[in-house]
Amino acid sequence: MLRASATRFLSQAKNMNNSPRLFSSASAALQKFRAERDTFGDLQVPADRYWGAQTQRSLQNFDIGGPTERMPEPLIRAFGVLKKAAATVNMTYGLDPKVGEAIQKAADEVIDGSLIDHFPLVVWQTGSGTQTKMNVNEVISNRAIELLGGELGSKAPVHPNDHVNMSQSSNDTFPTAMHVAAVVEIHGRLIPALTTLRDALQAKSAEFEHIIKIGRTHLQDATPLTLGQEFSGYTQQLTYGIARVQGTLERLYNLAQGGTAVGTGLNTRKGFDAKVAEAIASITGLPFKTAPNKFEALAAHDALVEAHGALNTVACSLMKIANDIRYLGSGPRCGLGELSLPENEPGSSIMPGKVNPTQCEAMTMVCAQVMGNNTAISVAGSNGQFELNVFKPVMIKNLIQSIRLISDASISFTKNCVVGIEANEKKISSIMNESLMLVTALNPHIGYDKAAKCAKKAHKEGTTLKEAALSLGYLTSEEFDQWVRPEDMISAKD
């Protein structure tokens, strides 16, 4: 009985993601189709979809991962920007304005996301992204045909290759769309999110500037600092992280468009590359420009590797910050307990009253994912052979995912954790006053060796540092009180 149930469950689990591939609410038996043709022949395509034969063929040939593995939406929107820009420029080179304007209108619908359901292809396809590029061409072609009152699938008066793809190749359009998508996401999502978190940490640094606590190195007691100083370190990490990300943009602004197949610009007109870059800059409001060397722009994606390297560094920073905060908030009674973190939800199904540092845990998992993505992008970026890198889809998938994860996690961490952090001043003071590392203040007065004897004696006998120092006869009570003052140990002396 159990075996039969398990078999049935496994069968259902295997098939559960197949039905969305129809992309229609109608049952398979009732769904209507139309004929579309590519160079391999005719194929039946769902009648309510704008894609054509090449997209349908890709759905059949690359049924890998299911709907969750589709090309990221920012890339599709970036393709809309590119196709609109190309149509604008191509009209100056002889493209029929009626056709060009219809392409622009259809591209606008790709840009605003209203056609996103017509882009079903997964990342796992040809490494140049040709299937997705043709998905874009077919959708824009059919939508433009519809706008002009024509018949879907007729390829007239708007042809997916001759008109939508005029003067373009997969090899230059896909890297162009990758750069546009990355830059738009960095500007519109990542930098604002990191800035919000940085500013919240900076506010906490100012709030905690008067609270003196014990420092820790090697997970052992060290000399004092203020809680504000500790948080200032986190603030500076993110300030540098934002600057690192911004520093990669100059290379991401360079666009491959105009290189066509191998970087030579075959089948384009002189000036096409620069004009398309100008049009993309106009549409997005961002300073895109044509790449100075199209051979590099097609064969290598070092700019994307560099950009994700900056994200990886940010992830390392966020991992350290989130871990520090949750360790400082450990307890509430048997941990460090120096910080009180916001209580957002119950923490345990078996331990009543338990509350966990969930925002810190979510952030550290995001960082782990980003670090993994960095490995994938590094491998992909190192594998461009001759005139073309053919790991493009996996690179942009991971880059866009990392940007989105870091951005969302930073906003969540700020709103649900950082702004609500409180200092447990009583616990902080208690821990600091028990620390033997305050003995460091005695170094200039009695020397390192004698100070070390004081610390070891206090630790061995379980006494206070002052009691040990007095029993050894190295100083008087008044001298100890004068020299061992935590508030005098948090900065350099004049």
Curated annotation (Swiss-Prot):
Transit peptide residues according to the UniProt entry: 1-15
A Pfam family that the UniProt record links to this protein: FumaraseC_C
Transmembrane segments: none
Site for Important for catalytic activity, residues: 361
Localization per Swiss-Prot or TrEMBL: Mitochondrion matrix; Cytoplasm; Nucleus
Any one biological process term the GO annotation gives: DNA damage response
Active-site residues from the entry: 218 (proton donor/acceptor), 348
One GO CC annotation: mitochondrion
Binding site for substrate: 128-130, 159-162, 169-171, 217, 349, 354-356
GO molecular function: fumarate hydratase activity
EC number, as in UniProt: 4.2.1.2
Additional record remark: There are 2 substrate-binding sites: the catalytic A site, and the non-catalytic B site that may play a role in the transfer of substrate or product between the active site and the solvent. Alternatively, the B site may bind allosteric effectors.
Protein name: Fumarate hydratase, mitochondrial
The species this protein was found in: Rhizopus oryzae
Gene: FUMR
